[in-house]
Each structure stands twice: as structure tokens, then as C-alpha cells.
């Protein structure tokens, strides 16, 4: 696992965006050979999306031949609702870059047959071969996507019941009213994430410090979903300084030295 220890959320977003752009450009995608990118929602990736938009506008990257798969979506929330993840992605990213609408894949939380929707999502990912890079965030309790604590590390896309803590955390997007936050969501599984060629998790803020410690210094444990990254051949965690407060000083020092060339000029 790589740990990229930075100072601020803006630096985390900038590093992540730069890494994505470098991966896309090195891949040289075409219509017949697109780059497949997994994407998250939430507050943490917003800085990355801002930097990706800026880099696109500066002519440094095109998303014309990029296919995206989002991590999750609420169940029962209308697509046009401002807090649906369909709305979030268009508002914060898709509407500002040159991605083709037919290349955007989002789970349908209003599907008549939820199981079929989840199965078809997995099948579509497989049809592209694999996701080349999956970017994600992490919850205070270590969940990735909506793979809450005790999720199977072999799980695939499915419906999940959201914990009360997750709903409280997400209530800030619903006017602070936890009762407005859906109780269920569709989410890619831990196994789906681990199938990606590369997984990059963004971790910012002191509230995520315990999750980061579990990911880097703890054991692989289904109660801390983020710890599954230890099983991945190409796992990257990009974090800001407050998120490292539970890590040993020597751990941070080690990774800072290892990644010195990759974190300069930010």
C-alpha cells in the first residue's frame, strides 16, 4: 500500500486529480479502448473534482473516451432530487467536462428489480474488462462506498442498510434532518473494488483518523472496510495532516520519505 501524506484537503484533491490525469493520458484511451474510472460522491472528493475540471479546461486531459462507474446511490430518492448521486455527479463534475452521457454509469436506486439492477451493473463492469482506477472516500467508521462495518470482503454490488451513524453524517446534505436521509442504498461491493486495477482512497480531517490508522497500521478486518486495501496490489491512500493524528510518527515519516518525489510541487 502507498500512503501519500499531505497537509490540506486541497493538496489531497490536487494530488488525486493529477494522478487520474496522468493515468488517463498514459493509457491513451480511444473509443474502442476507453479508460474505465470508478468515482465516489460526498464531501471529500469535491476538491479532486474541482482540480479535474480545471485541468480539463486547461487542455491537460479529455474525458471523451473515459467510461465511469459510480460507487453507490440512495434507494428511493428521485434521480432529480438535489442530493441524489446522479444530481451530485452532474452538478460537481460531469456537466463541466467533455464526457459522453453514454459513458456515464450510475446505479438506479429506483429500479423495479433491485437485484437485477445490481447484477447488470456488475456485468457491465465485466464487459469492459475491469475498472482501471477506482477513486473513493472513507467514512468515519472506515466504510468505503456504502460497505458498512462487517461487510463481506468478497461482496459484490447489492443493496445495503445504512447505519444510523452514516445517516447522521450524511444528514448535513439534507438540512440536518436525519429522517430525510434514505435508509437504504445500492453500492458496489468490497470485492468489486478489489477487482479494480488500482484503488485510490482519499482521507481528510481528524474525524477519519481512526479509520486511517486501521487501514495502515491495523489488521485486515471486516469491521474496518478500508483495511481491505492491504489486500490490493495497487492500493493508494491520499490523506491530509489531520487524518494522520492516530498514526505513529515513524509511520508518517516513513511514507513521507518514500513519497518525497511524488508530493513535491503541490
Curated annotation (Swiss-Prot):
Q: What EC designation does it have?
A: 3.5.99.6
Q: List the disulfide bonds.
A: none
Concerning Pfam families, the annotation shows:
Glucosamine_iso
What are the positions of the active site? 72, 141, 143, 148
- Please name the InterPro entries in this protein's record: Glc/Gal-6P_isomerase, Glucosamine6P_isomerase, Glucosamine6P_isomerase_CS, NagB/RpiA_transferase-like
Cellular component GO terms held in the UniProt record: cytoplasm
The protein, known as: Glucosamine-6-phosphate deaminase
Q: Which organism is it from?
A: Erwinia tasmaniensis (strain DSM 17950 / CFBP 7177 / CIP 109463 / NCPPB 4357 / Et1/99)
Amino acid at each position: 500500500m502507498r500512503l501519500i501524506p499531505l497537509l490540506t484537503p486541497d493538496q489531497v484533491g490536487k494530488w488525486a486529480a493529477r494522478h487520474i490525469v496522468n493515468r488517463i493520458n498514459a493509457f491513451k484511451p480511444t473509443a474502442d479502448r476507453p479508460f474505465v474510472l470508478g468515482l465516489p460522491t460526498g464531501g471529500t472528493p469535491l476538491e479532486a473534482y474541482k482540480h479535474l475540471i480545471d485541468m480539463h479546461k486547461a487542455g491537460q486531459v479529455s474525458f471523451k473516451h473515459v467510461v465511469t462507474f459510480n460507487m453507490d446511490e440512495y434507494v428511493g430518492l428521485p434521480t432529480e432530487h438535489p442530493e441524489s448521486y446522479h444530481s451530485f455527479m452532474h452538478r460537481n463534475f460531469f456537466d463541466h467536462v467533455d464526457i459522453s452521457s453514454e459513458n456515464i454509469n450510475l446505479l438506479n436506486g429506483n429500479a423495479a428489480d433491485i437485484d437485477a439492477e445490481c447484477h447488470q451493473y456488475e456485468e457491465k463492469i465485466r464487459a469492459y474488462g475491469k475498472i482501471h482506477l477506482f477513486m473513493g472516500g472513507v467514512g468515519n467508521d472506515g466504510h468505503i462506498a456504502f460497505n458498512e462495518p462487517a461487510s463481506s470482503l468478497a461482496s459484490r454490488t447489492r443493496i445495503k442498510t445504512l447505519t444510523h451513524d452514516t445517516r447522521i453524517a450524511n444528514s448535513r446534505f439534507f438540512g440536518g434532518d436525519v429522517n430525510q436521509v434514505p435508509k437504504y442504498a445500492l453500492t458496489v461491493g468490497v470485492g468489486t473494488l478489489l477487482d479494480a486495477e488500482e484503488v485510490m482512497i482519499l482521507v481528510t480531517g481528524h474525524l477519519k483518523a481512526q479509520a486511517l490508522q486501521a487501514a495502515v497500521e491495523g489488521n485486515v478486518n471486516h469491521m474496518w472496510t478500508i483495511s481491505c486495501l492491504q489486500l490490493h496490489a495497487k492500493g493508494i491512500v491520499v490523506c491530509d495532516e489531520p487524518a494522520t493524528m492516530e498514526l505513529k510518527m515513524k509511520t508518517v515519516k516513513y511514507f513521507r520519505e518514500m513519497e518525497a518525489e511524488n508530493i513535491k510541487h503541490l
